[in-house]
């Protein structure tokens, strides 16, 4: 999974913040992710993550940022970060939608990423709703 170094960086945090709010409001029956990557990552505290997820968590608890602190993303990610882990979009989708969704379809080009998603789905007791697809690249 060496190719997945984007987690916890600024663009990833913004994407996840928006994703969680959309899922919370829309409640889709089927969730599809074409480039899923992993569900959960051990944190590494890189400088990019310092300006990404760590900065977000720090600023969310400030007095004038109640909207961020009240976000579903903050609630989910801050709890996981206290354990030393960062949730990717597959885990966030499973956490926000839970059993409300009938199916989760995850596609990726790396089997190890899909194995990671599968382990998280079992932990969340959603394995019967989660379907994994290894994408093949043709040049």
List the predicted regions and their residue ranges.
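Conserved small/polar residues in nucleotide/adenosyl-binding loops
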Residues: 137-139
């Amino acid at each position: 999974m060496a190719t997945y170094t984007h987690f916890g960086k600024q663009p990833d945090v913004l994407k996840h913040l928006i994703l969680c709010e959309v899922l919370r409001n829309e409640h889709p029956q089927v969730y599809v992710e074409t480039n899923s990557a992993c569900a959960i990552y051990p944190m590494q505290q890189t400088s990019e993550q310092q300006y990404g997820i760590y900065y977000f968590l720090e600023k969310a608890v400030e007095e004038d940022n109640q909207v961020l602190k009240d976000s579903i993303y903050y609630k989910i990610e801050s709890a996981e970060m206290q354990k030393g882990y960062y949730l990717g979009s597959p885990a966030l989708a499973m956490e926000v939608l839970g059993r409300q969704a009938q199916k989760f379809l995850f596609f990726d080009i790396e089997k190890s990423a899909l194995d990671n998603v599968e382990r998280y789905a079992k932990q969340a007791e959603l394995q019967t709703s989660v379907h994994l697809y290894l994408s093949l690249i043709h040049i």
